[in-house]
């Protein structure tokens, strides 16, 4: 079965397979590289927020209210989002969930991981998401590299890693390349770069570092608004 990945720029992705659509960190308004409006995207079944910063929460509340999609987040951030207008009944698991925990929604299994960053509420997190057809991806959120990535790579067969490479606030290209090795990821899409001048402006250094640290991990360079289709049966190759 095929999986379609769309990058809306920054850390904002949609992943769709098996009739299920997952949206992560839906930063549209104020995103200088977003190629579309939040109300013009494919309808998500589930929205995941990695942490409470404006460039990651984005328009999550508006999207969930407009579509009825459930919103997944860490305990603590749920209260802040409800206070901001998210109906409590749209919070996944009622109160959110926590690091190491796994919940299921629309046939999708979501495991929350730690992330090393900051957050206005709760704590920053990442997600390992297994789609209905078994395709598994890891969205790291904003994070520095951490050694426990190796454990997540042992626990889950990660078909695709979505990793920040921008530096300053997150991993830089060298750290992100080593993270691919720790995670044993089959393929990677770099994110959190090029959005603002302070961040890494291209993926050149990441490509060079990936060749050194994880040469078997396939790099997919995407531009905001672009979609690609992966076939899990073809070793993560684009179709």
UniProtKB/Swiss-Prot annotation:
It comes from the Bacteria. This is UPF0173 metal-dependent hydrolase Dvul_0081. Gene3D superfamilies: Ribonuclease Z/Hydroxyacylglutathione hydrolase-like (3.60.15.10). InterPro entries: Metallo-B-lactamas, RibonucZ/Hydroxyglut_hydro, UPF0173, UPF0173_UPF0282_UlaG_hydrolase. One of its GO terms (molecular function) is hydrolase activity. Keywords: Hydrolase. PANTHER family: UPF0173 METAL-DEPENDENT HYDROLASE MJ1163, UPF0173 METAL-DEPENDENT HYDROLASE MJ1163-RELATED. Pfam families: Lactamase_B_2.
